[in-house]
Amino acid sequence: RNSGPLLLLCCLPGEFHEIGMLFFALAAVDRWYRVLLLGANMTLDQIPEVIEQQPCEAIILSGSARPARGLFQDALPQLVRNTSIPVFVGGGVAERNRETIENAGAICAGKDIKPALGIIDKTLSAAA
């Protein structure tokens, strides 16, 4: 059984492509992370309540499609403000929206799994 940090994983609102997130979850577990997988099409305003019930060390949001209007300008900054843990955005949507994601206070993890895990490792190590 893994004893590493617990990561909350879910797809962005309107995102139904879970395969990349599932591959990421497998790679994270292989690196001794624990994973709380919420699945596709998750509204971001529900995440703080989940974190209250099951404390996690980071939130990982996944997306490959075009983000919903206002997602990175409104909902993402609100999530960052309403949680005290790092919020990462990964997948193709992250590559195309890096500046907007970072302006929202989240961390762009990119679309490739191994480098994304490196970014998460480094961020969580610095916070410890």
Role assignments for model-derived ranges:
Residues 1-54, 58-75:
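Conserved binding/catalytic microenvironments
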Residues 27, 79, 100:
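Hydrophobic/aromatic ligand-binding patch that stacks against planar heteroaromatic rings
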Residues 31, 82-83:
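Helix C-cap/helix->beta junction micro-motif
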Residues 70, 85, 125:
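Short glycine/threonine-rich loop/turn motifs
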Residues 83-85, 106:
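A short helix->loop->beta-strand "cap" motif at the edges of active sites that frequently abuts
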Residues 92-128:
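Peripheral docking tails and interdomain loops at the edges
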